Structure formats: structure tokens, C-alpha cells
A protein has these predicted regions:
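Conserved NAD(P)+-binding/catalytic subdomain of aldehyde/semialdehyde dehydrogenases
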Residues: 179-266
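Conserved small-residue-rich beta-alpha loop and adjacent elements
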Residues: 108-173
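A glycine- and small/hydrophobic-rich beta-loop-beta segment
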Residues: 261, 269-345
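C-terminal core of ALDH-fold dehydrogenases
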Residues: 322-431
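N-terminal Rossmann-like NAD(P)+-binding subdomain of aldehyde/semialdehyde dehydrogenases
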Residues: 1-124
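Alpha-helix C-terminal capping segments
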Residues: 143-154, 176-178, 196-203, 220-222, ...
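Short internal beta-strands
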Residues: 154-163, 267-273, 280
Length: 431
């Protein structure tokens, strides 16, 4: 794990590389992903079944591809009651939060009597990609399905890989909680292709959301425009601003909570106190030995971990804004004041009792967040990803009489005669 002072001679170069990180090099997988997409687009189910047999090692058909609601119910009934209660609590909290962010259709008349407005409409069909196998996270299903449900999407389809034809039990239970009626055992770029183009079994969707590996991210990038997507997600990342008021063990474990996700995950502490930074590093070395995913976390910490000692909290904030992290924790006595100064972060976790893990599961806000610095221009997944906005315009005689001449001047200046004429004939009719 790198330990750097901002006053170090090589700090600027190191931090510039950190800021300019990407969501992964897609060039190596682009040819293979492009071929998968083209095969599914051209051959539909035939290609889909071939790819599932190749990658997931089971032989599907149109019937076995679909996950039945009875499977979801059975999984839900069979899990531990405490876990069932936790999933239901998470569902309710995520639902409550997203209901508060529903955009509302509006209309109003301006001073010329022109009626203007915006109409928000849920999409007809949404495709949710949810990783499976060892990386099967029911929380990802909740975080993608709930905003689609709240938005009022007509049809929601889930695709998840099923190695050997088996789907993770907790994932099935989460599907039941969300009331999912349509789900398929297909993963990777194949699933993205099916949802983007449609096959004989899986209908085309209007949007594809959800996390995935580099193959899924590349596929989503390539089908964008054919359908909408949420974002191109890369490895998980956390940045923590903390000072001596924080418990160094707490901060160490918070950093490891992202490092255990992925060998490419990044965990960065920015602190104005060098002794505190050293204490956090000692606790990381102790705590990492206790993790079941210690080998993954160790690679992440060694390759992508950093403790940065800044001159003061103002510099900590400046560096965090430049980094634009997916997750930003602020563990200082004046955490709320520092949070007000943050412009670029996927989610901000404020105060000593707000570990990032609470946001991952059941605080309420979405855990699908922009990575790789894209928090500068992307927002977390929300109901807006499952809706579209349509402009509303209605002029009466008064409105076109008062605004028509200006409109004709602009049309004339752009050399668009029919535009000008469409206004002129109406003005003439009013004389």
C-alpha cells in the first residue's frame, strides 16, 4: 500500500494517474464481445443457447432458460427468517427513498398564454443484468429492480448467469420480494445482446442496467443507442477523508470493504494527520488477515491502495473532488461541513457511524454508482433511468401572434423557408 505525502516530489505524477484512471481497458475483449453481440443479433436463441453451453456449462432450451416464479417463491420460503427479514427491510427502505425522487409532470402558462410543460413517462420494458455465481449479490437485484418498480415500468426482465443451470438462492429470494415475473438464466455479453436486440425467447428492452465484468461493460457500451444504458461501471472504489477524531480501525475496515470486492478495486485514505495514516495502515495489515477474501483484498491493497497525507482538510477536500470517487466517506468532526464542499462523488457517507456498507445494503440510496472518475458527470442509478421526459407545448392565437414574428426572423436567418411559412400561414389566418 502506497503511503504518500502531498509534499513528496513524485506525488503530482502519482495522483494524476489516480485521477485519470479508467473503467478498464476494453480493447482486449472488444473483438470477442462484438462477435457475441453479432451472433445473437443474427441467430437469436440459437446463438444464445450455444454461448450458454460454452460459458456456463449446461444445455438450455426455451423452457429451461426461464426462471419460474415458483422457484423464486420456494427460495424465499427456504432462506433463514432473519435473512428474509433483512431483505424485506432493505426493499422497503430502498423503495421509500426512491419514491421521494420521482419526478412530477408539470404544466404552466407563461405571460404570452403559451402552455409549457414536461411529461414524465415510465419506459415500457427494462432489462436488469444481475451477476451470478460467486459474485451473486441479492442487493444488486434490489438496487436495480426497486427504482424500475417505483418508476412504473410496464415489464421488468432479469438476466443472470446460472453456472450448471443453477441460480443463487438469495438472488431468487430477492426476485420474489421484488415481484419479478420474467427472468432468464443467461449472463455475460450474451445477456446484454438478448436484451438489446431480442431473441425468439427474450423480448428487446428499452434500457439495460446493472453491474458486471469487463465483458458486460463492453457489451453495454457497444449496444448503447440501440437501447439506453445506466452507465459503464468499472472496478469498485472508495476514498475516505478522515482525521484523528476517527477510529483508525474503523477506517481500515472500511477501506478493506471495497478491496475485498475485486483485485482491481481501489481504496484511498486522505488525511491531514500522518500519525493517523500510519495507524490506519497498521490496522489494515492486521484486519486483512481475518478476511475470507484475503487474497483478493491483498492484491487490491498492494496495487490500488494508498494513504495520502495532505497539509490540511481543505487540501483533503480538493483532492477528493479531483478524484471524483464512487464512494466517499468523511469521518471528521465537521463531516457535514466538508460534505457541503464536495462536488464530485457517487455517494457521500457522512460521519463516524456511516460505513459505506450501510449504503451497499439498506440505507436507501442506490448503490449502483459511477466509477473511474465518471462521478464528475454521471449520477447514481435512480428512477430517472427508467423514465423519459417529453416536452409539452401549446400556443393559442394570442401566443402565436405575440411570438410568431420573432420565430419567423430566426427561421429566415437559418434559411428554412417552410419553418417560416408554417408560422406565417397561421398569422395570416388570424387577420
Amino acid at each position: 500500500m502506497k503511503f504518500l505525502l502531498t509534499s513528496n516530489e513524485n506525488f503530482k505524477d502519482y495522483f494524476a494517474a489516480l485521477v485519470n484512471r479508467s473503467n478498464g481497458d476494453m480493447s482486449a475483449v472488444m473483438p470477442a464481445v462484438s462477435q457475441i453481440l453479432e451472433d445473437v443479433r443474427a441467430k437469436g436463441d440459437e446463438a444464445l443457447f450455444e454461448q450458454i453451453e460454452k460459458f456456463d456449462r449446461w444445455k438450455p432450451d426455451a423452457n429451461s432458460l426461464k426462471i419460474g416464479t415458483d422457484e423464486m417463491q420456494k427460495a424465499y420460503d427456504g432462506i433463514d427468517s432473519c435473512l428474509r427479514n433483512a431483505l424485506n427491510l432493505a426493499f422497503e427502505r430502498i423503495k421509500s427513498y426512491h419514491e421521494k425522487s420521482l419526478p412530477k409532470t408539470w404544466m404552466e402558462h407563461d405571460e404570452h398564454g403559451v402552455l409549457l410543460g414536461a411529461k414524465y413517462t415510465p419506459l415500457d420494458r427494462a432489462g436488469l443484468y444481475i451477476p451470478g455465481g460467486k459474485a451473486a449479490y441479492p442487493s444488486s437485484l434490489l438496487m436495480n429492480a426497486v427504482p424500475a418498480l417505483v418508476a412504473g415500468v410496464g415489464e421488468i426482465v432479469v438476466c443472470t448467469p446460472a453456472v450448471g443451470g443453477k441460480v443463487n438462492t438469495l438472488l431468487l429470494a430477492a426476485m420474489h420480494i421484488c415481484g419479478i415475473k420474467e427472468a432468464y438464466k443467461v449472463g455475460g455479453a450474451s445477456a446484454v445482446a438478448a436484451m438489446a436486440y431480442g431473441t425468439q425467447t427474450i423480448k428487446k428492452t428499452d434500457v439495460i442496467t446493472g453491474p458486471g465484468n469487463i465483458y458486460v461493460a463492453t457489451a453495454k457500451k457497444l449496444v448503447y443507442g440501440e437501447v439506453n444504458i445506466d452507465m459503464i461501471a468499472g472496478p469498485s472504489e472508495i476514498c475516505v477523508i478522515a482525521d484523528e477524531s476517527a477510529d483508525p480501525r474503523h477506517i481500515a475496515v472500511d477501506l478493506l470493504s471495497q478491496a475485498e470486492h475485486d483485485e482491481m478495486a481501489s481504496a484511498v485514505l486522505i488525511t491531514p494527520n500522518q500519525a493517523f495514516g500510519a495507524a490506519v495502515q497498521r490496522h489494515i495489515n492486521e484486519e486483512i488477515k481475518t478476511l475470507a477474501r484475503q487474497p483478493i483484498a491483498q492484491v487490491s491493497i498492494d496495487k490500488k491502495g494508498a494513504i495520502i497525507v495532505a497539509s490540511d482538510l481543505d487540501e483533503c477536500v480538493r483532492l477528493a473532488n479531483e478524484l471524483a470517487p464512487e464512494h466517499l466517506e468523511i469521518a471528521t468532526n465537521d463531516a457535514m461541513e466538508l460534505a457541503r464542499q464536495i462536488r464530485h462523488a457517487g455517494a457521500i457517507f457522512i460521519g463516524h457511524f456511516t460505513p459505506e456498507a450501510m449504503g451497499d445494503y439498506l440505507a436507501g440510496p442506490n448503490h449502483t454508482l459511477p466509477t473511474g472518475g465518471s462521478a464528475r458527470f454521471y449520477s447514481p442509478l435512480g428512477v430517472e433511468n427508467f423514465m423519459k421526459r417529453t416536452s409539452l407545448i401549446s400556443l393559442n392565437a394570442k401566443g402565436i401572434s405575440e411570438l410568431g414574428n420573432a420565430c419567423m426572423k430566426l427561421a429566415d436567418a437559418e434559411g428554412l423557408g417552410a419553418h417560416k411559412r408554417s408560422v406565417a400561414v397561421r398569422l395570416e389566418a388570424l387577420k
